[in-house]
From Swiss-Prot:
Involved in iron-sulfur (Fe-S) cluster assembly. May act as a regulator of Fe-S biogenesis. The keyword Nuclease does not apply. It comes from Colwellia psychrerythraea (strain 34H / ATCC BAA-681) (Vibrio psychroerythus). This is Iron-sulfur cluster assembly protein CyaY. InterPro entries: CyaY (IPR047584), Frataxin/CyaY (IPR002908), Frataxin/CyaY_sf (IPR036524), Frataxin_CS (IPR020895). Belongs to the frataxin family. SUPFAM superfamilies: Frataxin/Nqo15-like. Keywords: Iron, Metal-binding. Transmembrane segments: none annotated. HAMAP family: CyaY. NCBIfam families: FeS_CyaY.
Amino acid sequence: MNDSQYNLIAEALLLAIEEAIEDSGVDIDYEGVGGLLTLTFKNNSKVIINKQAPLHEIWVATKFNGHHFVLNNDSWTDKRSGEEFWQFLSNAVSTQAETELTLSAQ
């Protein structure tokens, strides 16, 4: 994957996250700027998702830890655990929002 392809795919992922948050109906504020998406919850905790263009990765920082995701066969997966991105994000957001929800790309 070249840099242009990465940027298109990563930007599409960030947009899909915004749309999934909006569609969830849960009160989560989000702000995206320059490849960085910040989710802010009622309890003032945050999840920060950002592009790491030089590495062709997506990094996610939660209240508890950080994760690096790489694109494998059209699916973003955690470099350490192998967990799929949307499953991980659903769990992280559910924990920090203190309500169960499932996020996915539309």
